[in-house]
Design a protein with these regions (language model features):
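A short, structure-level motif marking secondary-structure boundaries and short turns
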Residues: 10-11, 42-43, 85-86, 136, ...
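A signal for specific C-terminal beta-sheet/loop modules enriched in small/flexible residues
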Residues: 30, 37, 131-143
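Conserved anion-binding
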Residues: 1-46
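Active-site-adjacent loop and "lid" segments of alpha/beta metabolic enzymes
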Residues: 50-133, 142-155
Length: 155
């Protein structure tokens, strides 16, 4: 929501259009025959609401239970300080790029748009590790990983 970049503003766009469009995006999607939603929380750069987008992940899951995620890997590429820093410290870039995906996962995200396909070799093991952490954390509350979960494939 360009008019209200808060959690409430993001929810409002989906619910009723939040005064920026005539109806909510969920209603529009339903009218188009879409009934399986992937909720992208629209991450903005650091200093412009990136944290709000992550917090919106919890709100979306709590309110609707729909799968939620984002292209959070765009945050490091929009970070001016990191662009300068990586000129002398190239090793910092992939850590922040791949690490950003873990933030979305640990905030309850169901998917991450991890960036160009070249990132897959770094992103997949890191994201699998985060999935295993989450699986272990949820075990004592009765949540079991699905059969093809990294917990079973990689341990």
């Amino acid at each position: 929501n360009p008019m209200d970049p808060t959690v409430e503003g993001k929810i409002g766009i989906w619910e009723d259009g939040a005064g920026t469009i005539d109806k909510g995006l969920l209603e529009m999607a339903a009218e188009c025959g879409i009934d399986k939603y992937l909720m992208d929380v629209a991450v903005t750069p650091l200093g412009q609401g990136a944290g709000v987008a992550v917090r919106t992940s919890f709100a979306v899951k709590s309110k609707w239970g729909y799968p939620v995620g984002s292209g959070i890997h765009n945050v490091p590429s929009a970070w001016d300080w990191l662009r300068e820093y990586k000129k002398d410290h190239k090793e910092a870039w992939p850590v922040c790029d791949v690490g950003s995906n873990l933030i979305q996962q640990m905030a309850g995200g169901d998917f991450v748009l991890y960036g160009p396909i070249e990132n897959a070799k770094m992103a997949f093991p890191a994201c699998a590790m985060a999935d295993i952490f989450i699986s272990e954390a949820a075990k004592d509350i009765g949540t079991e990983p699905v059969e093809d979960h990294p917990f079973f494939k990689l341990l």
